[in-house]
UniProtKB/Swiss-Prot annotation:
Organism of derivation: Rickettsia africae (strain ESF-5)
GO CC annotation, single: cytoplasm
A Gene Ontology biological process term: DNA synthesis involved in DNA repair
One Pfam family per UniProt: SMC_N
Keyword DNA-binding: yes
PANTHER family the record matches: DNA REPLICATION AND REPAIR PROTEIN RECF
Residue sites binding ATP per the record: 33-40
InterPro entries in the record: DNA-binding_RecF, DNA-binding_RecF_CS, P-loop_NTPase, RecF/RecN/SMC_N, RecF_2
Key word DNA-binding present: yes
Keywords: ATP-binding, Cytoplasm, DNA damage, DNA repair, DNA replication, DNA-binding, Nucleotide-binding, SOS response
Protein name, per record: DNA replication and repair protein RecF
Top-level taxon of the source organism: Bacteria
Length: 360
């Protein structure tokens, strides 16, 4: 098994940190400090070395320390391709983010070629009751860990969709270019939908196989393209292309693309109660989310032979003793780098003896 982990992390003008230098090992790491000390900021900085905008999905201008023009995050990281230096920096004046791998610029969606991460934050506990966009992004992040090329596909799809919207809204008379764009969107959609379905199959098996103290979930996806594939429809690319063509007039008025894999929803059910997670109590929702994360970790390691970095923000809060102890034993048994935030060590003393403590 290959472990992805940080050897060091350096922050400059990042949120509340003017400068911060951390040295770490391939072990559990506990960030301990009062609320507002910057624990979650450190997790967020690490998450920037994975496709997307980090675990807060924050606007980049907001991550710079107040009154500073730039911020920098640097990491020496054991990646899928070996030891490497990664940097990501943002300048307010240019409103640009630049990410580098060993001093060579790379696109944000390329990061999944080098790293693998899973995270769980208090904000995510509302994912079952929020909009479908949050759940879809959550599912796609899971897919990244099984298929690193998926991030690039999602990025390309969003680019072509933006181009299509622009042509329609601005009434640009170029039917040939529009046809090419819709064909590209259809082809990419087919790959995205199949990747999601394949990952859901893996994840469902992982959930069913893992005996733990958390409720099991049934996973599915509610999307026209995915359902057509599940129903065995042939020529799926031609079907998507035709749908995009037929919705041109409607989408011109709406100013957006009304059909496609960007409209799909990730559905989660409490297996035993047979009800959608959004109708469960907040405590049950958190427990289901933890169960999904544990299954993802287990199966990602089993299938890809790669252990991701795990970021857990205040994960032990509001867990009963039985579940907290099970989670601690599970995490220790992973033998990988994971980052946990907490305001105190009460209830996790045993875990703390096996972790690197960083006090803020």
């Amino acid at each position: 098994m290959k472990n992805i982990f940080l050897h060091s992390l350096s922050l400059e003008n990042y949120r509340n940190f003017k400068n911060l230098e951390l040295k770490t090992d391939n072990t559990p790491i506990i960030l301990i400090g009062e609320n507002g000390s910057g624990k979650t900021n450190i997790l967020e900085a690490i998450s920037l070395f994975y496709p997307g905008r980090g675990l807060r999905s924050a606007k980049l201008a907001n991550v710079c320390k107040t009154s500073e023009d730039h911020c920098l995050v640097k990491a020496l990281l054991q990646s899928k391709l070996g030891l490497a230096e990664f940097t990501t920096q943002f300048k307010r004046s240019s409103n640009r983010r630049i990410t580098e791998y060993n001093e060579s610029k790379i696109a944000n969606n390329e990061l999944s070629k080098f790293t693998s991460m899973v995270w769980l934050t208090p904000h995510m506990e509302g994912i079952f009751t929020s909009g479908s966009s949050d759940r879809r992004k959550f599912l796609d992040r899971i897919v990244y860990n099984f298929d690193p090329k998926h991030a690039e596909l999602v990025s390309k799809y969003e680019y072509y969709m933006h181009e299509r919207n622009k042509i329609l809204v601005e009434d640009i008379r170029d039917d040939n270019w529009l046809k090419i764009i819709e064909e590209k969107m259809a082809d990419i959609s087919n790959h995205i939908a199949n990747n999601r379905l394949k990952t859901l199959e893996f994840m469902q098996q992982a959930i069913d196989d893992l005996e733990n103290e958390f409720p099991k979930a049934d996973l599915s996806i509610d999307g026209i393209v995915e359902q057509k594939i599940l129903n065995g429809k042939k020529n799926i690319v031609s079907f998507i292309t035709a749908e995009l063509y037929q919705t041109r007039s409607k989408d011109k008025l709406l100013g957006r693309t009304s059909f496609g894999v960007h409209k799909s929803d990730f559905l989660v059910k409490h297996q035993k109660k047979n009800i959608l997670a959004k109708f469960c109590s907040t405590g049950e929702q958190k427990a289901i989310l933890i169960a999904i994360i544990l299954a993802e970790m287990n199966y990602a390691i089993k299938l890809t032979k790669i252990a991701p970095i795990l970021l857990l923000d205040e994960v032990f809060v509001h867990l009963d003793d039985k579940r907290r102890q099970y989670l601690i034993e599970f995490l220790i048994g992973l033998n990988m780098q994971l980052w946990v935030t907490t305001t105190n060590l009460e209830g996790i003393e045993n875990f703390a003896t096996k972790a690197q403590l960083i006090k803020l």
